[in-house]
């Protein structure tokens, strides 16, 4: 019932907003001026045609072909004309590819929430999925022909099927995700690693449980009451942990105990070595895709397809700082509540010496990142249609001290994200998540909030299964809706013109 409710309610805002956007902005805008004509070339059967300004693979265009093909018979009946297939690939129809993807994405979010939090009520899981469907960056680009919505949908489908241990299907969704946006290969590696963590830690616990059972059996003939009691206690501890290798919905040791991380890494490495052939077989579909992608990079001479001079891989470590703050601000009730501030202080107080060292290291890393690895891409400085343009000019670059003043806020935001994840995730999983986020964001020279969507969703999916009252989620949803109303109103009803270029310009993320 929850899936149907999510799909139906999501459609209630997707359909009317799509109609409004297509009515007011019928022509391709911004990046659509590249994507729409390219998709229309595919609709015409010109699969060898390629716009050299497009940086991403053609996965979205093939999805659109399938989407238009599914609509085409109905369009012929409704219009009662001999409209050709290529004529059916209008801007509005191509945009509807993302509208359908957004509905599917909401259902996937619901399914993942239910899997990670089986004790959650259907009502609360439905509400959480609906709130996450309103995430401003995801919601806004639902109504335009960009790759973001389809990319997120494919990644979530890959993750859900991996959680369910359907690895071949997961790798197929991963292939689609990479074919839509090539940086998704990093998220494919993340999903594969999370699957390996699941598999190896579960295997090691099952082995430990079998050893305890054997010891219990041997001790039964020795009348060792104390030994049997201790073994039963050990068995109980292992059994309670084996039911879920990631302790979904249960608090795991906090980040102050680094021995847990070291032990888990040792367990994963040793178990992986012992099970290396089984792991290679189970996860071989992921390996094939990653190897094929590596061959593509060698053949292509880089990761992007077109406009390579404007998308040079850079060391932009400040990008992960921006991600933490943007994510924390979007979900301020989670990060800046009295309870969360108290929890953060309690975590620091429990092991103040280690916490002090970690805080100092994080602050130093933050200062180094913003001082030496803070980039201002020419696109960022020249295009006042994007909100990051104003963020950079009015806040980050308003004064030379400002970027340093923000470092403690960045660090707090990351600590808050990690402590929320630590309530439901093992530290090895958190480490892999952090590395994947860095792998996607650090090489990217351009500040684009759209790039934060996938790591944001993964954080929210794993923090929501423990936290948060209904009121907290209602407040987050209110923030999302308020931002969406503002950004869409600015996009639709506050157009402006440039003196040096014809056409109407609009504010966009």
UniProtKB/Swiss-Prot annotation:
GO terms for molecular function: dolichyl pyrophosphate Glc2Man9GlcNAc2 alpha-1,2-glucosyltransferase activity; glucosyltransferase activity. It holds the Pfam family DIE2_ALG10. Residues 215-229, 239-254 have a biased composition (Polar residues). Disulfide bonds: none annotated. Residues 210-254 are annotated as: Disordered. Pathway: Protein modification; protein glycosylation. InterPro entries: Alg10. Residues 26-57, 121-124, 192-285, 333-355, 422-428, 494-509 are lumenal. Glycans are attached at residue 351. Disruption phenotype: Small plants with reduced leaf size. Hypoglycosylation of glycoproteins leading to ER stress and activation of the unfolded protein response (UPR). Increased sensitivity to salt stress. Keywords: Endoplasmic reticulum, Glycoprotein, Glycosyltransferase, Membrane, Transferase, Transmembrane, Transmembrane helix. It is found in: Endoplasmic reticulum membrane. One of its GO terms (cellular component) is endoplasmic reticulum membrane. It is a multi-pass membrane protein. One of its GO terms (biological process) is leaf development. Residues 1-4, 79-99, 146-170, 307-311, 377-400, 450-472 are cytoplasmic. The chain crosses the membrane at residues 5-25, 58-78, 100-120, 125-145, 171-191, 286-306, 312-332, 356-376, 401-421, 429-449, 473-493. Its EC number is 2.4.1.256. It comes from the Eukaryota. It catalyses: an alpha-D-Glc-(1->3)-alpha-D-Glc-(1->3)-alpha-D-Man-(1->2)-alpha-D-Man-(1->2)-alpha-D-Man-(1->3)-[alpha-D-Man-(1->2)-alpha-D-Man-(1->3)-[alpha-D-Man-(1->2)-alpha-D-Man-(1->6)]-alpha-D-Man-(1->6)]-beta-D-Man-(1->4)-beta-D-GlcNAc-(1->4)-alpha-D-GlcNAc-diphospho-di-trans,poly-cis-dolichol + a di-trans,poly-cis-dolichyl beta-D-glucosyl phosphate = a alpha-D-Glc-(1->2)-alpha-D-Glc-(1->3)-alpha-D-Glc-(1->3)-alpha-D-Man-(1->2)-alpha-D-Man-(1->2)-alpha-D-Man-(1->3)-[alpha-D-Man-(1->2)-alpha-D-Man-(1->3)-[alpha-D-Man-(1->2)-alpha-D-Man-(1->6)]-alpha-D-Man-(1->6)]-beta-D-Man-(1->4)-beta-D-GlcNAc-(1->4)-alpha-D-GlcNAc-diphospho-di-trans,poly-cis-dolichol + a di-trans,poly-cis-dolichyl phosphate + H(+). Belongs to the ALG10 glucosyltransferase family. Dol-P-Glc:Glc(2)Man(9)GlcNAc(2)-PP-Dol alpha-1,2-glucosyltransferase that operates in the biosynthetic pathway of dolichol-linked oligosaccharides, the glycan precursors employed in protein asparagine (N)-glycosylation. The assembly of dolichol-linked oligosaccharides begins on the cytosolic side of the endoplasmic reticulum membrane and finishes in its lumen. The sequential addition of sugars to dolichol pyrophosphate produces dolichol-linked oligosaccharides containing fourteen sugars, including two GlcNAcs, nine mannoses and three glucoses. This is Dol-P-Glc:Glc(2)Man(9)GlcNAc(2)-PP-Dol alpha-1,2-glucosyltransferase. It comes from Arabidopsis thaliana (Mouse-ear cress).
């Amino acid at each position: 019932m929850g899936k149907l409710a999510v799909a139906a309610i999501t459609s209630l805002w997707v359909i009317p907003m799509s109609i409004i956007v297509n009515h007011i902005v019928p022509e391709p805008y911004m990046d659509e001026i590249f994507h729409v004509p390219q998709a229309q070339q595919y609709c015409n059967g010109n699969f060898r045609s390629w716009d050299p300004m497009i940086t991403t693979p053609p996965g979205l265009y093939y999805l659109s072909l399938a989407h238009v093909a599914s609509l085409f018979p109905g369009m012929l009946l409704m219009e009662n004309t001999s409209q050709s297939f290529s004529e059916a690939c209008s801007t509005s129809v191509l945009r509807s590819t993302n509208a359908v993807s957004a509905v599917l994405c909401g259902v996937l979010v619901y399914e993942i929430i239910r899997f990670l939090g089986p004790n959650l009520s259907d009502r609360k899981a439905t509400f959480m999925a609906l709130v996450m469907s309103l995430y401003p960056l995801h919601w806004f680009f639902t109504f335009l022909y960009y790759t973001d919505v389809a990319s997120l949908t494919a990644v979530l489908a890959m993750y859900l099927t991996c959680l369910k241990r359907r690895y071949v299907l997961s790798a197929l969704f991963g292939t689609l995700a990479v074919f839509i946006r090539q940086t998704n290969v990093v998220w494919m590696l993340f999903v594969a690693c999370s699957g390996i963590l699941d598999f190896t830690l579960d295997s090691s616990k099952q082995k430990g449980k079998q050893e305890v059972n054997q010891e219990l059996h041997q001790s039964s003939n020795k009348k060792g009451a104390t030994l049997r009691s201790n073994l039963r206690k050990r068995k109980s501890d292992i059994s309670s942990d084996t039911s879920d290798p990631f302790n979904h919905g249960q608090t795991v040791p906090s980040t102050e105990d680094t021995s847990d991380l070291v032990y888990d890494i040792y367990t994963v490495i040793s178990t992986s070595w012992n099970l290396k052939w089984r792991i290679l077989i189970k996860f071989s579909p992921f390996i094939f895709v990653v190897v094929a992608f590596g061959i593509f990079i060698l053949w292509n001479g880089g990761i992007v397809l077109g406009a390579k001079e404007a998308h040079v891989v850079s060391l932009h470590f400040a990008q992960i700082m921006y991600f933490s703050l943007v994510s924390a601000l979007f979900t301020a009730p989670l990060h800046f509540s009295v309870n969360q501030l108290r929890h953060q202080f309690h975590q620091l107080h429990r092991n103040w010496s280690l916490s002090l060292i970690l805080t100092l290291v994080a602050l130093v890393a933050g200062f180094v990142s913003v001082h030496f690895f803070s980039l201002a891409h020419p696109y960022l400085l020249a295009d006042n249609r994007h909100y990051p343009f104003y963020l950079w000019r009015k806040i980050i670059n308003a004064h030379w001290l400002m970027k340093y003043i923000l470092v403690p806020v960045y660090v707090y935001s990351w600590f808050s994200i990690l402590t929320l994840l630590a309530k439901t995730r093992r530290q090895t999983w958190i480490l892999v998540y952090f590395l994947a986020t860095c792998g996607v964001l650090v090489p990217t020279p351009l500040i684009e909030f759209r790039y934060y969507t996938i790591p944001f969703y993964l954080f929210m999916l794993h923090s929501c299964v423990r936290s948060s009252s209904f009121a907290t989620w209602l407040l987050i949803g209110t923030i999302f809706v308020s931002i969406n109303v503002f950004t869409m109103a600015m996009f639709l009803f506050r157009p402006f013109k440039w003196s040096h270029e014809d056409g109407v310009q609009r504010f966009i993320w």
